[in-house]
Structure formats: structure tokens, C-alpha cells
Amino acid sequence: MKNLLSMEALTVHEIEHLLEQAAQFKHGKKATLKEQAFAVNMFFEPSTRTHTSFEVAEKKLGVEVVSFDAATSSMTKGETLYDTLLTMEAVGVNVAVIRHSEENYYAGLDKLNIAIVNGGDGCGEHPSQSLLDLFTIKEQFGTFQDLKVAIAGDIRHSRVANSNMKVLKRLGAKLFFSGPKEWFDDSYLEYGTYLPVDEIVEKVDVMMLLRVQHERHSGTEQFTKASYHEKFGLTVERAAKLKQDAIIMHPSPVNRDVEIADSLVESEKSRIVTQMTNGVFIRMAILESILKEQEMRAKVCTY
């Protein structure tokens, strides 16, 4: 794997391999990188989980982390992302993890040799989050085939939803969507069925909630926190109707008592904290896969 830009770029075999490697890391597998490697985490949007878990993953692998602050970089002087990455490549950085507000920011960067891991591109995709979600689901159920998965909330503005709806259908899951119609697009019906939240909770094995992304809204939405929770959120009353073995997921950050009741965030059915933990192991698997391929290419070139 040279880069990780979108879930669509991964084959089912590659996905299964990454999930297996993540499971091995979780059960104590040690890193097997042979050469010194450097990574830079370039975040142009706020991030807690993605940024910190990539950094922890890098350090667990023995990868040196190069500091980068967009606000103090030469990009404030007009330097392009391409030229910034060209610089990183020139000084010996192997992989760049990038979070950017612009969708498809990585278009045109394929000429570079530095590997790119998409840490989220606007409302586009979030492949490492999608992979950790798959890892969490597989840990619980062992399979994706015929699982009923609900994706509920601010779907239109969610890069997580974009990644997950495509890959879950490809892996054999049955998808349901719910949330405000204003934040839904009929193009999603290619992947699943739209239903009101009260018609979904009793059906599904996985209740995947999405944050209300106020920063991406036009300001015309009419929901208060309380009214959103009442109409569309996972309330305590709705959660009581979930199947006995159903799980609750959320990519975080969580708006408590908006998309999910406060008391449910750390409840028995919740896998929200588990998702965060699993994020380190899946990101270790992603980085190891990329860096091992670089090692292999370098070895071939020396003969």
C-alpha cells in the first residue's frame, strides 16, 4: 500500500489484512520495521483522537515524529501543500498524515514519493476512522455479512458516513439511514434505506451515531440541542429498544444529550471508548503496511 486516501481504493483483501494486523497489534505483536522512518502529522483542522492516536501509533512502531504546526509553517507565506510535502520528502520524511478542510486535497500529489495518509478531507472521506469502525464491528460480531447497521445523524456533512456506507455495503452489511431530511441526500439510497429513528432501533445490530457538525452548516438549521435529541437522537428510551447484543458506536467527538444521551456514552452497549482504543492499533497497521512497502521498494532498487 503506497498511500491511504479513500476506502474505495482498498480491495477487500487489503481491508481484511489491515484488520488482521490491527488485531495482532492489539494482542501484543511487536513492530517489525527494519529501517529508521519519519512521519509528519499535518492537521489543518482541529483534531484530538485522530491526531493523538496516529502519534501514539507512530511511536509504538518506533517511527520518529517530525513536528509541524500549520500556523507557523511557510504555508502562511503562500507555500502550497505540494511544495510543503516536497520539502518533507526532500529532508527524508517517509509518510505524511494530513487532515484538511478541502475535499480531495490530495489530487495532484501523486507525483510525490512521500506516502500520504488521509486523516480526513472536508466532507469527503476518513479512511482510518472507517477502518477502526470495521475493526470494532468485527471484534464484536466476527463478520459483516448480513449485519444490520444504522448510520444516524448529520450524514451529509460526515466524511465518516461517506467512507462507511460504501465499504459496509461492499462487505455485505445491510444499511439503514436516519436523521434530519435536511442532512440527507437521495444518492445515499444506493447504499441503504432511510427510516425514522424510531423504526430503526429495534432492527439493527450496530447503531452508529454521527456528530452534528455545526461548523459545516449554513446557519439555516432550526434545531436546538434538546429538540434534536428528542426527534433524532439516541435517547435512553430508544436505547432500551435495541437488541440485546446490539452495540452503539460514534466516531467522536460526542455531543452528549444531542445525538446520544449522556448516560449511554459509557454504557454496557457502547463501544465508543473501544473505538478510540482500536484507533491506535488500526493506525499502526496502516503505517506498518505503507512503511514495509517502502522498505521493500528500496531493497529492490539496491540490487
From Swiss-Prot:
Name the source organism: Listeria innocua serovar 6a (strain ATCC BAA-680 / CLIP 11262)
Keyword Transferase assigned to the entry: answer is: yes
GO CC, any one term:
cytosol
Write down the NCBIfam families for this protein, in alphabetical order. Answer: asp_carb_tr (TIGR00670), PRK00856.1 (NF002032)
Report if keyword NAD is assigned: no
* Reactions accelerated catalytically: carbamoyl phosphate + L-aspartate = N-carbamoyl-L-aspartate + phosphate + H(+)
Pathway(s) of this molecule? Pyrimidine metabolism; UMP biosynthesis via de novo pathway; (S)-dihydroorotate from bicarbonate: step 2/3
Family per UniProt? Belongs to the aspartate/ornithine carbamoyltransferase superfamily. ATCase family.
Gene behind the chain: pyrB
Q: Which protein is depicted? A: Aspartate carbamoyltransferase catalytic subunit
Which molecular-function annotations from GO does this UniProt entry contain?
amino acid binding; aspartate carbamoyltransferase activity
